C-alpha cells in the first residue's frame, strides 16, 4: 500500500463532504475518526484505507452503531466496509460485539464477523468463530458451533444458534447441550430467554443430574429456580424409582416431582409398579403419594400382588419400604383377595395389615360391611383387624392372624344356602404352598358345620361351643375339627335344624365383594374424570437467516454499481437444505385415555 501523507487531509475532507452530500438522500457509513487515510492501488474499486494512530482506533458510525478497529477498508460507492484487528461493534447500550474481522454493509445493514467473535448482551455472552448480524431484523446467527454463557444458568453449546435481540431470545438447534454445575441438559432444539433463564425443550431431551434424570420430548425448565414441566413420553428417574406420566412437574431444590394422568411409578429394586392419575414423589423422604384409581403391583416370580385404594402412599428406603392404602382398599392375587378401609404392607417383614378406621364403631350398622375381609381359596375370614404374614424370601404366604370378632366362613359344597361357620375372639391360620391348612380359633369359639360322609351325603348339621377350636384343612376342605374345652355340642338332622338358627351371630357372607380379577377393583369406583392438560406452545421452526427480505436488500444494494461485484452478497449464509421439523405438540385431551 502506498501512503501519501500530503493527501491524508484531503482524502478525509473529501470523504466527509461526500458523506454529507448523500446524508439527505440515504444515511451512509460515516467516519468519526481515523489516524491515517490513504488510497491503495492494490485494492480494487479505489477503496479508501483508514488506519489507527497511537492515540485511538479508527471509528465509524452508522444508524446507531459504533465500530472501532485498527484498520478499515471502505468501498464508498457500495457503502461497504471491512474492519481488521481488534474490531469492536457496539449497538446502543446493550449489544457489544468484538472480533478479529468484520464486514458491514450500510445498504443491507448486514454484518459478518469472524475470528474469536464475542457478542455480549446484559444477561449473556455468545462466543463463536463466525457470526452474522442482520440489524434490520435485529437477528444474530451462527452455524459453525457456538457457546452462550449465562452465569446462573450455565453454558449452552450448539451447532446452530440465533439470537433475537428485540425478543431477547436465543434459539438453538442441532446438538444442543446446556452444562450447569448441577446437571447437563441435552436436546434437539432449545429456546432460551436470558432475562429470566427460561428454557423450552423440543424433541428428545434429557436433563441428567447427580441423583435424577429427566426425559421428555416437550418441556420447560426454569434455570433460575431449577423447576421444570415436561410432556410427551415424559419420565423422571430417581436412581431406583422411575416416574412416568402425561405431565410431570419437577423441583430439583426440593427433590420433588408430581405427575398428572396415566402415571406409572416403577421401583426397580423392590420389583413394584404403582399406577394412578395424580402422584407426588419426594425423593429425599423416599415418599410416594398417588391417587385417582391408584393401583400398586408387586411383581413376583409366579404371581403378582395387586393393591388398590382411593389413595396409596409408599414410604421408606428400599430395604424398609411400607405401602399404605387408604379408603376402600382392596388386595388381589390369584389365590388370595382382601378388602378393608385401610391396608398396610411392610415389604421388609412381609406383614400385611387389614385395618378398619376407628370411626366405624360396633354400634354402627354400616360397620359390619366395612370389617376387613380376606378370602383364601373357598374360605372367607373377617375380623376387626387382620394380619397376613408372608415369607419375604420365598414370597409365599406364611400365617394369618385375625384380632377380635374372628369369623371363618366357607360355603357348603352342595346345599344352596348352607355355610360352614367358625367364630371366636381370635384366629390364627397357617399356610402351606399358599393354601390354608391349619386354623386355630381362640376363646369363645362357636361353630356350625355341615357333616357329610364319604359319598358326600349330608349326615347332619353340627353346632357347638368350646374354649378353642383347631381345624385341619386338606385339599381345600375341612378334614378334622378338634374342640378344646368343649362346652356344648350336638349334630342335628337337617330337618330338625331350623333355618333361622343356621347362622352364627355376626354372620356376613360377602362373596359378591370378592374381586376375581384386577378389573373388578374399579367396578365400584366413581367415574374417572381426568383434567385436560394444557399443552405447551408448539415449536415454531426458525425462518431462514437468508430470507426473502434479506435477498431483496442485497439485490437492491448492487443496483448502484451494476458493473461491479456486489460486495453486500459476500459471506451470506446459504439456505438450509433440511426440511422443517415435523414435531408438533397438540394440546392433551387426557379424558380420552384410561
Give the positions of each predicted feature:
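Bacterial N-terminal signal peptides that target proteins for export
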Residues: 1-10
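Bacterial N-terminal signal peptides
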Residues: 10-18
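Conserved adenosine/adenylate-binding substructure
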Residues: 20-22
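N-terminal amphipathic/hydrophobic interface segments
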Residues: 24-594
Amino acid at each position: 500500500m502506498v501512503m501519501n501523507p500530503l493527501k491524508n487531509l484531503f482524502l478525509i475532507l473529501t470523504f466527509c463532504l461526500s458523506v454529507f452530500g448523500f446524508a439527505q438522500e440515504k444515511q451512509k457509513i460515516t467516519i468519526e475518526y481515523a489516524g491515517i487515510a490513504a488510497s491503495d492501488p492494490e485494492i480494487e474499486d479505489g477503496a479508501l484505507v483508514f488506519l489507527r494512530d497511537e492515540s485511538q482506533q479508527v471509528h465509524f458510525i452508522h444508524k446507531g452503531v459504533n465500530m472501532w478497529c485498527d484498520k478499515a477498508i471502505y468501498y464508498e460507492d457500495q457503502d461497504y466496509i471491512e474492519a481488521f484487528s481488534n474490531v469492536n461493534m457496539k449497538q446502543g447500550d446493550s449489544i457489544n460485539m468484538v472480533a478479529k474481522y468484520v464486514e458491514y454493509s450500510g445498504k443491507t445493514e448486514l454484518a459478518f464477523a469472524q475470528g474469536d467473535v464475542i457478542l455480549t448482551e446484559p444477561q449473556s455472552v455468545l462466543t463463536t468463530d463466525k457470526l452474522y448480524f442482520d440489524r434490520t431484523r435485529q437477528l444474530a446467527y451462527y452455524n459453525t458451533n457456538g457457546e452462550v454463557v449465562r452465569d446462573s444458568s450455565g453454558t449452552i453449546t450448539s451447532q446452530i444458534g440465533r439470537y433475537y435481540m428485540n425478543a431477547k431470545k436465543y434459539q438453538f438447534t442441532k446438538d444442543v447441550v446446556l452444562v450447569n454445575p448441577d446437571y447437563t441438559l441435552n436436546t434437539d432444539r432449545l429456546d432460551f430467554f436470558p432475562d429470566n433463564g427460561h428454557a423450552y425443550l423440543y424433541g428428545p431431551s434429557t436433563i441428567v443430574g447427580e441423583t435424577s434424570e429427566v426425559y421428555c420430548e416437550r418441556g420447560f425448565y426454569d434455570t433460575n429456580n431449577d423447576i421444570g414441566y415436561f410432556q410427551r413420553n415424559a419420565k423422571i428417574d430417581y436412581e431406583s424409582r422411575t416416574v412416568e406420566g402425561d405431565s410431570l412437574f419437577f423441583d430439583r431444590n426440593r427433590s420433588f416431582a408430581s405427575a398428572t394422568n396415566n402415571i406409572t411409578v416403577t421401583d426397580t429394586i423392590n420389583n413394584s409398579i404403582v399406577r394412578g392419575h395424580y402422584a407426588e414423589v419426594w425423593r429425599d423422604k423416599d415418599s410416594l403419594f398417588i391417587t385417582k384409581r391408584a393401583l400398586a403391583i408387586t411383581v413376583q416370580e409366579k404371581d403378582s400382588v395387586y393393591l388398590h385404594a382411593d389413595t396409596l402412599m409408599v414410604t421408606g428406603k428400599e430395604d424398609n419400604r411400607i405401602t399404605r392404602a387408604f379408603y376402600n382398599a382392596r388386595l388381589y392375587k390369584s389365590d388370595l383377595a382382601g378388602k378393608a378401609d385401610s391396608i398396610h404392607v411392610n415389604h421388609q417383614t412381609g406383614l400385611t395389615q387389614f385395618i378398619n378406621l376407628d370411626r366405624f364403631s360396633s354400634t354402627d350398622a354400616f360397620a359390619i360391611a366395612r370389617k376387613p375381609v380376606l378370602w383364601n381359596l373357598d374360605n372367607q375370614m373377617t375380623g376387626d383387624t387382620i394380619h397376613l404374614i408372608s415369607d419375604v424370601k420365598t414370597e409365599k404366604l406364611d400365617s394369618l392372624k385375625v384380632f377380635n370378632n374372628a369369623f371363618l366362613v366357607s360355603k357348603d359344597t352342595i346345599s344352596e344356602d348352607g355355610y360352614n361357620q367358625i367364630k371366636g375372639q381370635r384366629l390364627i391360620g397357617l399356610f402351606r404352598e399358599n393354601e390354608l391348612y391349619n386354623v386355630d380359633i381362640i376363646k369363645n369359639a362357636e361353630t356350625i358345620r355341615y357333616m357329610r360322609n364319604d359319598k358326600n351325603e349330608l349326615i347332619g348339621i353340627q353346632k357347638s361351643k368350646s374354649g378353642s377350636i383347631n381345624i385341619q384343612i386338606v385339599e381345600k376342605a375341612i378334614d378334622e375339627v378338634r374342640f378344646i374345652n368343649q362346652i356344648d355340642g350336638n349334630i342335628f338332622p337337617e330337618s330338625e335344624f331350623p333355618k333361622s338358627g343356621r347362622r352364627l351371630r355376626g354372620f356376613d357372607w360377602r362373596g359378591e365383594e370378592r374381586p376375581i380379577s384386577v378389573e373388578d377393583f374399579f367396578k365400584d369406583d366413581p367415574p374417572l374424570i381426568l383434567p385436560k392438560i394444557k399443552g405447551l406452545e408448539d415449536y415454531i421452526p426458525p425462518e431462514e437467516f437468508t430470507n426473502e427480505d434479506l435477498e431483496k436488500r442485497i439485490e437492491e444494494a448492487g443496483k448502484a454499481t451494476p458493473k461491479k461485484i456486489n460486495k453486500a452478497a459476500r459471506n451470506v449464509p446459504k439456505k438450509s437444505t433440511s426440511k422443517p421439523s415435523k414435531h408438533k405438540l397438540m394440546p392433551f385431551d387426557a379424558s380420552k385415555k384410561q
